[in-house]
Amino acid sequence: MPIIEKTKYSYNDLTIEPAVISSIKSRKECDPYEHMDVNMRDYLPLFTAPMSTIANEHNFNIWKKNKIMPMLPRNIGADPNGSIEKRISYIKDFLDNGDWVALSLKEFEYVFVEHKMMSPGQIFPGYNRTYRVCVDLANGHMECLYDTINKAKEIARNNNYTLIVMTGNIANSETYRWICKHAEVDYIRLSIGSGSNCITATQTSIYYPIASLIDECKHIKNRCEGKSYVKSTPYIIADGGVRGYADVIKAIALGADYVMIGSLFTGLLESAAPLDIECYNSHYKYGYAAGIINDGINNILNLWDGLEDEDNNDTLVKIDNKELEQKKKDFIKDMKDIVKESYGMSTKKAQKLINPNAKSKTSEGCTKYIHVKETVKQWSDNMIDYFRSAMSYTDKKYINDFRGKVDLIINSSSAILAVNK
């Protein structure tokens, strides 16, 4: 096989060119919310990654409230003995509610192809319901994955329920073209090896720079839409490698329909990752991931925005006891740092969360510790403002006009240094 000599680009290589002149008077005129896709209507174009350190059954609605679409990861409800039925029973309310839930290929086949949950008195999947499922694999290039999805889609039609399927990950734009022709996929996750907790590229050399991948898939999608030979034109999800607000905006500017965020969300205060609180006079560890929310974490949550902004507690419980309030203030003064543990789902730790008795595979993930700087609300508010600002510079009032319809500049190495301060 020949060496491909065409240069490929990552987010770091690009910046967005402003319009020559903008008719927008204020960035408040710009609307960064999704309105075209019924599955994501009125949300920001953002998913949480299906990682055990981000969303769980305890904080699920916090993400929703802040217009970020949460994904319930594969460890939630996982049975120590590997029982698929017990796991599905635990998360059934999320599935019935139409929430996004991550399943393994085996779980997906068990429920939506073999219909093994349709026991007497328990009709599941249910008639006229909509199920939103992410078949969560590392390797989205396997033909058997798409054969299974096609079977499940046909069975769903024959049984009068709707099945919305996300899968991936892929790292070749020609794979996207193949999926358009051969598979009924609704959403596809792009990128292998670009996530900060992923070491696949480092250890296997499988990698495709994500900015070029998004751009190439976008052009294929545009050419395939409406063609008779096409089975689907999946929404493009840029998954991995997002270091901050600018990378989210670049991904959408390149043509991604959505961005999926992992470790960046792990570092937010309410994420499912355990807290490590360092104080000047003491040291605390709190397992928020297990739903243990005790005084220490409540202290931080209630006073996160500072003592002068104590009314900003809409997602939290207020305690009126004056003595306890004083304790909280003292705790905040004593607090030095908050750290969250972030690890990829292919780490041995994450594998054990999904199935404690299974033999661990060679890890293609790593563990990092992230300093907490923001709440989910603070991050979301900032993202909205930065989105609106970028849209106003490029003279785009609506996200669908901004997506894939602005010009990007390839920068020199010295220009990149000037941007990445």
Where are these regions (language model features)?
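Alpha/beta catalytic cores of nucleotide-metabolism and tRNA/nucleoside-modifying enzymes
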Residues: 1-22, 205-238, 243-421
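Active-site entrance/lid segments in N-terminal catalytic domains of soluble metabolic enzymes
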Residues: 1-235, 263-268
